[in-house]
């Protein structure tokens, strides 16, 4: 059964992963975000309770 011989298939697997790992990461890392996140304030905003007139 030739499909059980790992010699050609293993090299194809290794070379395809080498191609993916050398081409795709630079393309993905080249993307820039449209807006950088700004650091949020550590102070909690002052919230006041509001009476709901239920009756």
UniProtKB/Swiss-Prot annotation:
Keywords: ATP synthesis, CF(0), Hydrogen ion transport, Ion transport, Membrane, Mitochondrion, Transmembrane, Transmembrane helix, Transport
Region (Disordered): 34-55
One example GO MF annotation: proton transmembrane transporter activity
A Pfam family matched in the record: ATP-synt_8
Composition bias, Polar residues: 38-55
GO biological process: proton motive force-driven ATP synthesis
Subcellular location: Mitochondrion membrane
Topology in membrane: Single-pass membrane protein
RNA-binding among keywords: no
Record bears the keyword Ion transport: yes
Transmembrane regions listed in the UniProt entry: 4-24
Top-level taxon: Eukaryota
Recorded GO CC terms: mitochondrial membrane; proton-transporting ATP synthase complex
Subunit structure: Component of the ATP synthase complex composed at least of ATP5F1A/subunit alpha, ATP5F1B/subunit beta, ATP5MC1/subunit c (homooctomer), MT-ATP6/subunit a, MT-ATP8/subunit 8, ATP5ME/subunit e, ATP5MF/subunit f, ATP5MG/subunit g, ATP5MK/subunit k, ATP5MJ/subunit j, ATP5F1C/subunit gamma, ATP5F1D/subunit delta, ATP5F1E/subunit epsilon, ATP5PF/subunit F6, ATP5PB/subunit b, ATP5PD/subunit d, ATP5PO/subunit OSCP.
UniProt function note: Subunit 8, of the mitochondrial membrane ATP synthase complex (F(1)F(0) ATP synthase or Complex V) that produces ATP from ADP in the presence of a proton gradient across the membrane which is generated by electron transport complexes of the respiratory chain. ATP synthase complex consist of a soluble F(1) head domain - the catalytic core - and a membrane F(1) domain - the membrane proton channel. These two domains are linked by a central stalk rotating inside the F(1) region and a stationary peripheral stalk.
Stated family: Belongs to the ATPase protein 8 family.
Protein name per its UniProtKB record: ATP synthase F(0) complex subunit 8
Lineage of source species: Eukaryota, Metazoa, Chordata, Craniata, Vertebrata
Gene field: mt-atp8
């Amino acid at each position: 059964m030739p499909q059980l011989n790992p010699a050609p298939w293993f090299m194809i697997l290794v070379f395809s992963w080498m191609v993916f790992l050398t081409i795709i990461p630079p393309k993905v890392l080249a993307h820039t975000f449209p807006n950088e996140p700004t650091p949020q304030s550590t102070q909690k905003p002052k919230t006041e309770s509001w009476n709901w007139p239920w009756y």
